[in-house]
Amino acid sequence: MGLPSLLVEGVIGCTLVGGLVAVGSAALAVRATIGVVEFNRECVRGARRIVSSGGRCLVVQSPYGNPNQGLIRGEDEEIDNVEESTPVELTPLIEVKAEVDGKEVVVSKKRVVNRHLRQRFVRSIAIEAKNHFGGDISPSKANYLSVSKFLTGKCKERHVVPAHTRDCVSAAMVLVFTPDVHEIRMMAGLASDAAYGIKIAMASILNRKGWCWRLMVNPLDRARWWEMWCVVNGFDSNKPVTFPKXGGLFYLNGVETKIRRGGHPSVIEVDGQCPLKERKLYVQNAITTGYEYRVHNHSYANLRRGLLERVFYVERNKELVSCPQPEPGSFKEMGYLRRRFHRVCGNHTRISANDLVDCYQGRKRTIYENAAASLLDRAIERKDGDLKTFIKAEKFNVNLKSDPAPRVIQPRSPRYNVELGRYLKKYEHHAYKALDKIWGGPTVMKGYTTEEVAQHIWSAWNQFQTPVAIGFDMSRFDQHVSVAALEFEHSCYLACFEGDAHLANLLKMQLVNHGVGFASNGMLRYTKEGCRMSGDMNTALGNCLLACLITKHLMKIRSRLINNGDDCVLICERTDIDYVVSNLTTGWSRFGFNCIAEEPVYEMEKIRFCQMAPVFDGAGWLMVRDPLVSMSKDSHSLVHWNNETNAKQWLKSVGMCGLRIAGGVPVVQEFYQKYVETAGNVRENKNITEKSSSGFFMMADRAKRGYSAVSEVCRFSFYQAFGITPDQQIALEGEIRSLTINTNVGPQCEAADSLWILNRKYQ
């Protein structure tokens, strides 16, 4: 192909392209002209519709409707027909009187619900929710779940049917998460020029310059010269009044009971005149929920009242009376359960003294080593079973009861404990497993972590279609353990040890107790038949055994028991509530116990077991102590803070234990984290754990939790359990992080109570 041919083809191509461009331009011009004509035509039609409809056609209708505009404006919607009602098939049946064939009869008809009333109801529950959750609520998942649960509960209280409940809750949610006129006015007031001026005035007063500066600025003001004269003569300059921030470390002296009443012929009293030795309770009050704790002194007055009111008598109608006794033959009825317990538990033999000593550590191990060595030289004697009584060093809440009867501890000699421990120490775990099998699942919650306890409760809860939990415990369980109850308990042990004569002799010493209690200002000597002595080796085992078997004997229905001594929770079907409540109180009274049944609960988080509630953290369940109690109780120490280092060591021990059992839990993990941060790099003192060998430290022994982010699901579950809203949780955590615990020991002062949201006085 030559050059002329290329030129010819180029000319032809350009001509064709130019023609196509021209045709396209003409087509666009024609379409634009048509579009202008169509637009003008639609404008004319639109103007005609606006004029003919009076402007109503301008309102854009949502495909889902917009029923909440009137609610948000706070006004009722205009309804053409006031009698218009909700769909008939969604309303409940009601019984009304009607006249049929001249006779008045009762007929069922659908309730008519006026939409004006619906709107007022929606606004009413929305206002209740705003008041409960504190006004403007952040749009988090936890808050959404909490508000939805709250609104649904309000509808259930008014017996709203499920279809209407869904409708009302969805409408009220819009109002709750939308600022109302009151919140707008509040924020407008806070942002006003007047409020700004007041804040500036306050800041200027609090940030006053020194007296020298004020004198130079106003040299002709006689007040400035008089202030200088006062400063030169040793007085303070004129400064704004400030109040010292509460917080720091101090101690409280032990308390004496103010009540002295009663007496018993089996108690010999010797009131001495020696000076009293006071106990001390150490406190940090920078972070508190308002509860105050004290500790009883080991004194004659406390010892006397503790023995009389917790061992010999019970209170009824504000009078001291003898403990109730079981009905004759009541424990014989449970012979079949003893035989079943023996079959499941099997036969056992005692362990060696060395094996028993190996079960302990620290100071207690040394005591039992010496006792075991003495038994090699001298056999067990009757006097080894005598009791040595003292007042328990226990923190008690003065806000709940200002002057309770002190608790007494009544241990027998270490020699007796070694002999009895050789039988029961290792056997105890087999006995718990036997009780589990009798009840059909984990029952005795001894030795489990908080996660394991909660998981066992959750498993028991899921065994029922409509579960309900009924908590119950026995008032002063140890005091109500009669001779008949002890004999039944002992028969269970003897059956498993094939009637061992030495064990029978040891257990017989518990039927008639001889004890003495010494204090610095007096002493008491007494004899008591029956009653559980709190220092016995078999206290925990015996209480669990009696509680589980008596409850099993009383409950002839399908149920599950969660037990820890005298603290019990029974889970069953809702249809069996009346049977359980009626049989618990009357049934336990036949065995000489005073059973107190709590209100049934229908939600997992509402269960209370050992002063803890189940909380779901997003991955699993765990038991959480009530923050109102734990955050105040864990601010008080029975371990002496002799110096700042001891105080920090205690803070570190408590903080680390708290994080191990409550890591990832709202509010409380920040509380324990603040303890750890305050302690800094102080060396851990393991002796503190031994001195504070309480349930708190024992719970943390096998726990493996730690500080972690709090999930939205956990915040919702925490709200369900303790009523602290998610926004309040976040606010409390921020408050705790901003606080500083002063570890210098100072004078006694009132608690800071900075976490007032948790304080029951304000709820």
Curated annotation (Swiss-Prot):
Coiled-coil ranges per UniProt: none
EC class (word): transferase
Record's keyword terms, sorted: Nucleotide-binding, Nucleotidyltransferase, RNA suppression of termination, RNA-directed RNA polymerase, Transferase, Viral RNA replication
Protein's UniProt keywords contain Translocase: no
Entry GO MF terms: nucleotide binding; RNA binding; RNA-directed RNA polymerase activity
Pfam families from the UniProt entry: RdRP_3
EC number: 2.7.7.48
CDD domains xref list: Alphacarmovirus_RdRp (cd23239)
GO annotation, biological process: viral RNA genome replication
Its biological purpose: RNA-dependent RNA polymerase that plays an essential role in the virus replication.
Entry protein name: RNA-directed RNA polymerase
Organism this protein belongs to: Carnation mottle virus (CarMV)
